[in-house]
Amino acid sequence: MALSLQQKITDPNQGVYLIGTTPPKAGTAEDKTQRIAKKLLARLNEVEYDGLVVYDIQDESSRVSSERPFPFHATLDPREYSLLLRKLARRDVITYKSVAQRDAAEFRDWLGETARDYQLQNLVLVGSPSSNGTIKLSLADAYRELAEHPADVYLGGVAIAERHASKGNEHQRLIEKSAQGCQFFITQAVYNAQATIDLL
């Protein structure tokens, strides 16, 4: 019997290859969303991969003072796109969730909906892109809320090797996130191999 994505991630002898994608723009018609998903999966037809990652895109204009090269566009709910991709690809999906825009009660409702309506268990929670702007729920508070919630979640976190290169403390962040419930970590891309090696 094939191993689940959780089993592969948990087993240090298994390599895990994930493909990341973003949901289509908010307001995209259902039939067009289906076509986009099928086109993505057709491109991946010849690739051996273990699962898909669906990112939750947030407005990061508070992170930098200069104007972004591309304006922010809201996307469809990542849970909806995750559900569609899981159904079409018949592979496990990891769904990202940006937690800063909702307060604790809204986040608890979101967790309940995610378990009940979408049957999604593999989640990566991400915090605010910067300390500027409105933060309704911190990442640490979201981890606490999740720990007290009955939803069965396989929780992942984000590891940023470049942050380790500049601040030297990413390993401490990973240890803290592990203590807060993270069971695996994802690096979105390796821009600097040496920074990644140093972090590991």
Language model feature labels by segment:
Residues 133-134, 196-200:
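C-terminal helical cap(s) of enzyme catalytic domains, especially alpha/beta-barrels
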Residues 162-164, 191-195:
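Short, catalytically relevant binding-site loops at active-site mouths
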Residues 94-97, 184-189:
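Short catalytic-loop micro-motif centered on adjacent basic/acidic residues
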Residues 184-185, 193, 197-198:
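A long, hydrophobic alpha-helical segment
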Residues 2-169:
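Active-site beta->alpha loop and helix N-cap motifs at the rims of alpha/beta catalytic domains
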